[in-house]
C-alpha cells in the first residue's frame, strides 16, 4: 500500500504579512514559509501507518504545487520522514488549479490513499481535497479525525455532533483530515535532515489549467483595540471609556 500526502507551502502564523499594489498582491519579503499545519498532521499519521507493520504501508510520498523556491518546505517534509516527493512546477493560484495539477500527477502513480489537510492556514478554502477526489473519481471522506488499516481495509473515524462516525472505505480514496488525525506534528531529527538532502524530488511540468477564481484584493484585519486597566472602584472612568473610546453606550446628563 502506498500513501500520498498533499502539502501546501504557507506563511508561518507568527509572520507579519504585508500587501502591495493597493492591497492586491501579497508581499513575500521576510516571510518564513512552513508546511501547512493540517497537512503536517496528515503526514504524521501517514508515517505512523508506515511504521505499523500490520498496516502494510510501503511508502509515503508528498506532493506539492509550487515553484522551485518552495523546495525547502518539501525538504522539511522529507526530513520528517517522507520517502520521496513530487513538485508540480507551477505557481498555485486557486484551489481548482491546484487540485487539477495534483490529480494529474496522482494519475501517473498507483497510490492507495491520498491525504490532504482540511484547509490551508493562509486561505482556509477547504476545497482542494474534495476537488482532487472528484477529478480522480475516488471516494472521499472529509473531516477525518482517525485513520487505521485493518487486514488491508481502511477504517476512518469522523467527529460528529454527539459522538463519532466510523466508516470503511475501499481503496483508492482521498482522506481530508482534521485535528485528531495525529496527536501532534513530528519534528525532524538531525538524521532526518541529513537524509532529506539526498531524497528525490520529482519535478513535473504542469498541465494547462485555467484558474476559476481571481484574487481581487486583500483586506488586513482592523488593529486590535488597546487594553486599558481600570480600578474596580472607579465606575466613572469605566463609563467614560465605554462612551468615548469604545462608543458602545450613550450617557445623558
Predicted regions: what is each one?
Residues 1-253:
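N-terminal glycine-rich FAD/FM-binding segment characteristic of electron-transfer flavoproteins
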Amino acid at each position: 500500500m502506498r500513501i500520498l500526502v498533499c502539502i501546501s507551502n504557507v506563511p508561518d502564523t507568527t509572520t507579519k504579512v504585508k500587501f502591495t499594489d493597493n492591497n492586491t498582491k501579497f508581499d513575500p519579503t521576510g516571510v518564513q514559509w512552513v508546511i501547512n499545519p493540517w497537512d503536517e498532521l496528515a503526514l504524521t499519521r501517514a508515517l505512523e501507518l508506515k511504521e505499523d507493520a500490520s498496516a502494510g504501508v510501503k511508502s509515503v510520498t508528498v506532493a506539492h504545487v509550487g515553484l522551485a523556491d518552495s523546495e525547502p518546505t518539501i525538504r522539511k517534509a522529507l526530513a520528517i520522514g517522507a520517502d520521496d516527493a513530487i513538485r508540480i512546477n507551477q505557481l498555485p493560484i486557486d484551489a481548482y488549479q491546484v487540485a487539477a495539477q495534483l490529480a494529474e500527477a496522482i494519475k501517473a502513480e498507483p497510490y492507495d490513499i491520498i491525504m490532504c489537510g482540511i484547509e490551508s492556514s493562509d486561505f482556509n478554502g477547504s476545497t482542494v481535497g474534495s476537488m482532487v477526489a472528484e477529478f480522480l473519481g475516488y471516494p472521499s471522506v472529509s473531516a477525518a479525525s482517525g485513520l487505521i488499516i485493518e487486514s488491508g481495509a481502511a477504517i476512518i473515524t469522523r467527529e460528529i455532533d454527539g459522538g463519532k462516525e466510523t466508516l470503511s472505505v475501499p481503496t483508492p480514496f482521498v482522506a481530508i483530515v482534521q485535528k485528531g488525525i495525529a496527536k501532534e506534528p513530528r519534528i525532524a531529527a538531525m538524521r532526518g535532515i541529513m537524509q532529506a538532502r539526498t531524497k528525490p524530488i520529482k519535478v513535473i511540468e504542469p498541465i494547462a489549467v485555467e484558474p476559476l477564481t481571481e484574487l481581487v484584493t486583500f483586506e488586513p484585519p482592523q488593529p486590535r483595540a488597546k487594553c486599558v486597566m481600570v480600578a474596580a472602584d472607579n465606575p466613572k472612568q469605566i463609563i467614560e471609556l465605554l462612551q468615548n473610546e469604545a462608543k458602545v453606550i450613550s450617557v445623558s446628563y
